[in-house]
A protein has these predicted regions:
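ATP/NTP phosphate-donor binding region
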Residues: 1-86, 341
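Carboxylate- and glycine-rich phosphate/diphosphate-binding segment that chelates Mg2+/Mn2+
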Residues: 147-253
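Gly/Pro-rich interdomain helix-loop hinge
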Residues: 271, 275, 279-360, 403
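Glycine/threonine-rich beta-strand-loop-alpha-helix active-site module
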Residues: 70-176
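Flexible, glycine/charged-enriched surface loops at secondary-structure junctions
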Residues: 204-213, 228-238, 253-258, 276-279, ...
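Glycine-rich phosphate/pyrophosphate-binding beta-alpha loops
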Residues: 139, 244-282, 375-379
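Short, amphipathic C-terminal "tail helix"
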Residues: 359-405
Length: 405
């Protein structure tokens, strides 16, 4: 028996933030990140709407990009002290992901982070609080998903928390918030969304309910992302919807090894100057993984359907896969995203020599490959890689070499 889970309510369109007025409760804690929600006035509006709904409001701010286990624990302590019955997570993927993990710890103070990471092993939530997610970026779609990504910096590993229990009760998808994104963030979150949709469509867990969401999201992203990046605000608004559709798809169809690799490389080289930003990692790895997965006939055929829907041409599935890969690489060029780790600069832009030295990459490769194979997203990938194949695939992603295995 399969399951399809979405938030109970999804408010969308310009001005949807006002839906906070309709929430019923006594106390709400707002979890936010680095200040953009405050800078552009959205945090003040959220506080005002919640107070209008009759709630006492507390703010937990300063959640960092790629949130840490320590931040999760601090936030949970704040919740335990304040005792909210609504958790309002506001911003990009990081504050929403962090707030989801805080929610688990708030409901179950004795639970460990290791227990949280057991796939679909979270006990029932909502005994203390409900959850509302408000997205300000157009990529992660965590406002509608059963996933959260938390980084253990002591190990240099990002861990996915996966359970339908952490699907928000209410999602607010207001494009006004997304219009404030800086250009680089538009690129990275947009390619994250494209990866979500493509991986969901070829996942072994895809179904009739997820396929339409995934394929339509792909077409919308094809039509809207580059123009959104170049400043078209109508396309920016449309991308906010497209990424949400992709999120609905992958939350129920699951993902694949593009995400497994992104999770396990993202913080693996932080001691050498920077993270590999999640959306940029997905963008670099997606063409290589398509080439790898397409050795499986079923996956190849489904990539062919994607190419057809995008109008890319091709006389057979082999040609269609090649054209899809070519298209995605061109999209990376248009978005100023490098093609491989070797050319990934500390600021995420293409550079002759990136921040990850070759000898460091090769030294850490076996462990990264092992961790990627063990990632929660690997199980639904259409082709299961061996340790040797994962190491070879990661090398292709480092050097930008052909995937011929």
């Amino acid at each position: 028996m399969a399951r399809f889970t979405l938030p109970r309510d999804l408010y969308h369109g310009k001005g949807a933030l006002e839906a906070l007025k309709s929430l019923t409760g006594k106390k709400a804690i707002i979890c936010v990140g680095g200040g953009s929600m405050k800078k552009f006035g959205f945090l003040d509006r959220a506080v005002s709407y919640l107070k209008e709904a009759g709630m006492e409001v507390q703010i937990f701010e300063g959640i960092e990009p790629d949130p840490s286990v320590e931040t999760v624990m601090r936030g949970a302590e704040a919740m335990l002290a304040f005792e909210p019955d609504w958790i309002i997570a506001m911003g990009g993927g990081s504050p929403i992901d962090a707030a989801k993990a805080m929610w688990i710890k708030y409901e179950y103070p004795e639970i460990t982070f290791e227990d949280m990471c057991k796939v679909f092993g979270i006990p029932p939530l909502r005994k203390k609080a409900h959850f509302c997610a408000i997205s300000s970026t157009s990529g992660t779609a965590t406002e509608v998903t059963a996933f959260s990504i938390i980084t253990d910096y002591s190990k240099g590993i990002k861990y996915p928390i996966a359970d339908f229990e952490i699907t928000p009760d209410v999602a607010i998808v207001d494009p006004d918030l997304a219009e404030t994104m800086p250009k680089k963030l538009v690129a990275h979150t947009g390619m994250d969304a494209m990866t979500h949709a493509i991986e969901a469509y070829v996942s072994t867990a895809h179904c009739d309910y997820t396929d339409p969401l995934a394929i339509f999201a792909i077409k919308m992203i094809q039509n809207d992302l580059v123009e959104s990046y170049n400043g078209d605000m109508a396309k920016r608004d449309s991308m906010h919807n497209a990424q949400c559709l992709a999120g609905m798809a992958f939350s129920n169809a699951l993902l694949g090894i593009v995400h497994s690799m992104a999770h396990k490389t993202g913080a693996a080289f932080a001691d050498y100057g920077a993270h590999i930003i999640h959306g940029a990692a997905n963008a670099m790895y997606l063409p290589k993984v398509i080439a790898f997965n397409a050795k499986d006939p079923t996956a190849k055929a489904r990539y062919g359907v994607i190419a057809d829907y995008m109008g890319l041409g091709g006389a057979n599935d082999d040609e269609k896969v090649e054209l899809l890969i070519k298209y995605l690489r061109k999209m990376n060029d248009d978005l100023n995203i490098p093609h491989c780790i070797q050319h990934y600069g500390a600021d995420s832009y293409p550079t002759e020599q990136g921040f990850v030295p070759e000898e460091v990459f090769l030294e850490r490769l076996p462990e990264i490959a092992k961790n990627a194979i063990g990632d929660a997203c690997t199980g639904s990938n259409p082709r299961q890689p061996s340790q040797e194949e994962m190491e070879k695939l990661l090398k292709c992603c480092y050097y930008d070499t052909e995937v011929d295995f």
